[in-house]
C-alpha cells in the first residue's frame, strides 16, 4: 500500500462513500468520472443522460473507496521456480534465468480521507493498493542432467524452455511482485525424456514499476 499525492482524473467505481448517505445511495457501485480538487471530489455518473457533477467533501472521520480497473501489460522476471518431486528426484528449486510477458487485469483501490496538515489546514490523504491477475508467456533456462532425463552418461547443459501460466500480482508502487503457476516446454532433443516436460510448477514474479 502506498501514498498518492493526487488522484488522476478518470473513470472509477465508487465502492464506498462514507458520511454521505444520500449520495452513496445514488452513486454506490456506479461508474463515475472523478476529479480531485484539493479535499473535494467531483463525481460525474456515466449513466446519466445529462451528466450532473456531484461534490463529495473528504472528512477525517469518514472515507471514500474508489476502484479503477484496466488491462495491464508488463515484463517480469521469474527468479524462483519450485518443481514438485518426480521420478525419484526430490523437490527442485530453479533459480536460473526466466523472463515472461504478462497480460492481465489490474485493480487499483484508492482509499481517500482527510488529514490535518497543520492545526489550521486539512488536506486529502490518499492510499493506493494495486492487485492484478492474468496470464504470462516467456522464455527461460533449466539444468539438464542425467537425473532429469534418465539418460546415464548423457550431456549436461543449460536447456531453453518456453513457459506459460497464470499469475496474481501485488503492486508495491516501486515494484511489482506476484505468485505464478505454470508449465514448461523444453526445446531440444531431450524434450521427450525430460521428466518436467509439461509438468506444473509454482514460482515468484518480480518486476520494476516503470509506469
Please place each PLM-identified region on the residue numbering.
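Short loop/turn motifs that connect adjacent beta-strands in outer-membrane beta-barrel proteins
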Residues: 61-69, 109-131, 174-175
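Residues that define the transmembrane beta-barrel architecture of outer-membrane proteins
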Residues: 69, 93-99, 129, 158-164, ...
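Transmembrane beta-strands of outer-membrane beta-barrel proteins
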Residues: 69-75, 99, 129-137, 177-179, ...
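Transmembrane beta-strands of outer-membrane beta-barrel pores
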Residues: 77-83, 105-109, 137-143, 172-174, ...
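Outer membrane beta-barrel transmembrane domains
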Residues: 125, 130-162
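Predominantly the C-terminal beta-signal and adjacent terminal strand-loop region
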Residues: 173-211
Amino acid at each position: 500500500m502506498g501514498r498518492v499525492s493526487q488522484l488522476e482524473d478518470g473513470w472509477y467505481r465508487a465502492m464506498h462513500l462514507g458520511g454521505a448517505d444520500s449520495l452513496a445511495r445514488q452513486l454506490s457501485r456506479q461508474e463515475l468520472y472523478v476529479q480531485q480538487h484539493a479535499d473535494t471530489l467531483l463525481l460525474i455518473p456515466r449513466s446519466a443522460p445529462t451528466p450532473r457533477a456531484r461534490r463529495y467533501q473528504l472528512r477525517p472521520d469518514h472515507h471514500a473507496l474508489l476502484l479503477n480497473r484496466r488491462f495491464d501489460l508488463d515484463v517480469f522476471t521469474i527468479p524462483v521456480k519450485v518443481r514438485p518431486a518426480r521420478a525419484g528426484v526430490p523437490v527442485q528449486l530453479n533459480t536460473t534465468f526466466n523472463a515472461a510477458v504478462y497480460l492481465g487485469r489490474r485493480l487499483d483501490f484508492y482509499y481517500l480521507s482527510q488529514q490535518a496538515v497543520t492545526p489550521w489546514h486539512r488536506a486529502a490523504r490518499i492510499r493506493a493498493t494495486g492487485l492484478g491477475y492474468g496470464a504470462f508467456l516467456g522464455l527461460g533456462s533449466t539444468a539438464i542432467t542425467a537425473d532429469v532425463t534418465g539418460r546415464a552418461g548423457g550431456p549436461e547443459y543449460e536447456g531453453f524452455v518456453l513457459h506459460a501460466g497464470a499469475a496474481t500480482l501485488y503492486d508495491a508502487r516501486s515494484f511489482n511482485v506476484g505468485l505464478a503457476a505454470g508449465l514448461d516446454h523444453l526445446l531440444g532433443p531431450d524434450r521427450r525424456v525430460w521428466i518436467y516436460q509439461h509438468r506444473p510448477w509454482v514460482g515468484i514474479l518480480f518486476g520494476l514499476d516503470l509506469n
